[in-house]
Amino acid sequence: QASVSIDAKFKAHGKKYLGTIGDQYTLTKNTKNPAIIKADFGQLTPENSMKWDATEPNRGQFTFSGSDYLVNFAQSNGKLIRGHTLVWHSQLPGWVSSITDKNTLISVLKNHITTVMTRYKGKIYAWDVLNEIFNEDGSLRNSVFYNVIGEDYVRIAFETARSVDPNAKLYINDYNLDSAGYSKVNGMVSHVKKWLAAGIPIDGIGSQTHLGAGAGSAVAGALNALASAGTKEIAITELDIAGASSTDYVNVVNACLNQAKCVGITVWGVADPDSWRSSSSPLLFDGNYNPKAAYNAIANAL
């Protein structure tokens, strides 16, 4: 692991966590990955084990072995957990996406949220209740949930989640929320303002922050725009940056540091070989699980 924990240094500035992702495969494939997580990160998001295809592959038949492993590892090592994700159009079993009856889909939606959240009630800091529900132009994506239920699925999902675990922070999460003035950012802000005014219990906006090289400089403005929607908090939820330049990473960390509502940052992976975009070397540890220049730059900046 690194000589200094960026999580500890980030928390010293009043933030809640600087975390990463994990699941049984990456936590057991070698000893270096879990050692780095224990030493240098303060929060874990399950990479895949809490997605719908993993937790309810068949209607009413829930499988929690993968998510249990992640939650148990996180709890036994004192890490906060972000639950990810309850409702998403992707990694969605065919039995869900083929539902055409509104009342059936509402029932399925409520049951899925209730069952998954109940299992981990009191153990999860925040849930990504809805993931990637916007188009790039800021309109709502034509998912099965939107097409069959209508926009009201947003209210149903958040109200169900709130009733199950009142202490968990409830988030709406999306990507390409990385530049102020971009249509998707504007759409997120205007919709969340409207939903909050209608009493829908949204606590936070999650910005995935999957960036190209050089894009770190725009994140501060983007976070300020997202904060204007009126949620209690915001977070950077899936950070990785092509090329992993120190400048980009420090810009992103400072953006969260300087936005009072930004509670934490989750980096989407520990070391480059395990990244979903490994060819662009976007993470803070290299193929030998050694900290890269960007890691040390963050530590120095903090």
From Swiss-Prot:
InterPro entries: GH10 (IPR044846), GH10_AS (IPR031158), GH10_dom (IPR001000), Glycoside_hydrolase_SF (IPR017853). It is found in: Secreted. It holds the Pfam family Glyco_hydro_10. The modification Pyrrolidone carboxylic acid is found at residue 1. Residues 21-301 form the GH10 domain. It comes from Penicillium simplicissimum. GO terms for molecular function: endo-1,4-beta-xylanase activity. It comes from the Eukaryota. Keywords: Carbohydrate metabolism, Disulfide bond, Glycosidase, Hydrolase, Polysaccharide degradation, Pyrrolidone carboxylic acid, Secreted, Xylan degradation. The active site is at 132 (proton donor), 238 (nucleophile). This is Endo-1,4-beta-xylanase. GO terms for biological process: xylan catabolic process. Its EC number is 3.2.1.8. PROSITE patterns: GH10_1, GH10_2. The keyword Ribosomal protein does not apply. One of its GO terms (cellular component) is extracellular region. It catalyses: Endohydrolysis of (1->4)-beta-D-xylosidic linkages in xylans. Monomer. Disulfide bonds join 256-262. Belongs to the glycosyl hydrolase 10 (cellulase F) family.
